[in-house]
């Protein structure tokens, strides 16, 4: 199942009329009124995917209504789909494998801090199709949960195909989801040794053993894939690894905790806010706004605070 990030289209007739009049009669529709309509429209489409409501169009200051838009179920759906598209770029085989979507929606609907996406005590359970209803998934409490990273559908999705069972895909994906790790894919030449030993040599070390994110070292503290039909996993056995600039990490819980404590996590969250609202990362000239986004997010831990900081900036409606 592919959950896509969709923007709604269309503007109310009243708004179109205001735009039309603004171009023909300044006495009937002042410039600031047209600007208000444009601002209301941009805010509503960006945050909820819907055309602005009559009350938003009538508001003296549309940006003062941002909290109302952030409380709209349409925003929850829109942002959950967006986050899923950013953290799982390929289509999933089942709804439950889009665990990011379901947990993002749960966190937003229940006003949870954003870090619970990654370290909350939850599990994502597949719900089979029944009685004419399509297959879906549920978020349930689980004392052993680690966001969605220990949910079986997600683990299967990123079990990978490394010959010894190291979950390199999961090692990358956990870091990509939390801190926005970006590693370019490399195609090996025929006959290249792709085993753990082979990855220790040449250019392969640059991603797998040497850097901050050392994929092989991270994979060693994750459970291993031991069977393929059905897929099963066994606990890690190779002990703590020194990764993330010299930190000693023993398991996936330690890994997630360290990533969430990093400035990279805050940076990642605010970049998501910019991409969601602007369709692009932050520009260098927006450094002050980006810093405010990070400050507001740090104070509350609520991803809505990051989005509010960006959407409430005067430049958003200019």
PLM regions with names:
Residues 1-11:
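Bacterial N-terminal signal peptides that target proteins for export
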Residues 17-29:
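Boundary at the C-terminal end of the N-terminal hydrophobic targeting segment
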Residues 26-32, 155-167, 206, 211, ...:
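Electron-transfer interface patches adjacent to heme c in soluble/periplasmic c-type cytochromes
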Residues 28-69:
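N-terminal mature-domain "stem" immediately C-terminal to a signal peptide or N-terminal signal-anchor/transmembrane
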Residues 38, 43, 74-87, 264, ...:
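Long, charged, low-complexity terminal extensions
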Residues 43-44, 49, 83, 273, ...:
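Residue-level detector of buried hydrophobic side-chain packing
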Residues 65-214, 291-299, 311-312:
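Extended surface/linker regions that mediate inter-domain or inter-protein docking
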Residues 309-318:
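Short, amphipathic C-terminal "tail helix"
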């Amino acid at each position: 199942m592919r959950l896509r990030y969709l923007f709604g289209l269309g503007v109310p007739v009243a708004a179109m009329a205001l735009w039309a009049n603004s171009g023909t009669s300044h006495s009937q529709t002042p410039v600031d009124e047209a600007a208000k309509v444009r601002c209301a429209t941009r805010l509503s489409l960006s945050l909820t995917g819907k055309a602005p409501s009559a009350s938003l169009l009538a508001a003296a200051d549309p940006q003062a209504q941002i909290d109302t838009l952030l409380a709209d179920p349409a925003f929850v759906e829109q942002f959950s789909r967006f986050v899923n598209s950013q953290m799982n770029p390929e289509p999933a085989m089942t709804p439950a494998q889009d665990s990011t979507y379901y947990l993002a929606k749960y966190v937003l609907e229940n006003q949870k801090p954003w870090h619970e996406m990654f370290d909350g005590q939850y599990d994502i359970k597949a719900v089979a199709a029944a009685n004419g209803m399509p297959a879906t998934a549920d978020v349930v409490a689980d004392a052993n949960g680690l966001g969605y990273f220990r949910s079986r559908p997600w683990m299967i999705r990123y079990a990978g195909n490394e010959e010894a069972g190291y979950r390199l895909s999961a090692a990358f994906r956990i870091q990509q989801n939390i801190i926005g790790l970006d590693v370019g894919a490399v195609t090996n030449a025929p006959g290249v040794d792709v085993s753990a030993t082979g990855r220790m040599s040449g250019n392969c070390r640059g991603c797998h053993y040497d850097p901050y994110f050392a994929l092989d070292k991270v994979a060693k503290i994750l459970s291993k894939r031991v069977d393929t039909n059905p897929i099963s996993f066994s606990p890690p056995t190779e002990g703590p690894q020194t990764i993330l600039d010299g930190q000693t990490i023993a398991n996936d819980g330690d890994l997630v905790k360290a990533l969430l404590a990093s400035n990279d996590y805050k940076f990642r969250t605010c970049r998501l806010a910019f991409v969601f609202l602007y369709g692009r990362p932050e520009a260098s000239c927006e450094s002050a706004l980006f810093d405010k986004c990070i400050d507001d997010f740090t104070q509350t831990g609520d991803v809505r605070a990051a989005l509010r900081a960006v959407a409430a900036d005067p430049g958003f409606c200019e």
